[in-house]
Amino acid sequence: MDAKQVRERLIAMGINFFSADLFIAYHRERPKIWEEFAAAALALCEDGERRISAKHICEKIRYERQMEKRGEFKISNSMVSLYARVFVLKYPEYADRIVLKEAVGPKVEAA
């Protein structure tokens, strides 16, 4: 899924245009965040976790990095829910396990 598709799908999920564009720019500058987020989320799903919050995923990464002395995991709190939405788009088989809060923007049909 390319950046344009991600943007369109986020907007269809109720994320406003500004936040979707901000997320795409943020991701382009920090692609490693997605790699770690997706890997941690997949591990939790495959371990049988039934309800997983995006905040929990980020805190798990932060904790593991601290224990392994790999440096801090820095992610803007305003981006956490967007990473969760992208995870659900990329891995729809786990959509029922990822807790998503209601987006406050208007829902529109994706192109």
Residue positions per predicted region:
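Intrinsically disordered, low-complexity serine/threonine- and proline-rich regulatory segments
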Residues: 1-35
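Serine/threonine-rich low-complexity intrinsically disordered regions
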Residues: 2, 16-20, 53, 76, ...
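Positively charged, polyanion-binding regions of nucleic-acid-associated proteins
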Residues: 21-56, 62-68
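Charge-enriched amphipathic alpha-helical scaffolds
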Residues: 55-96
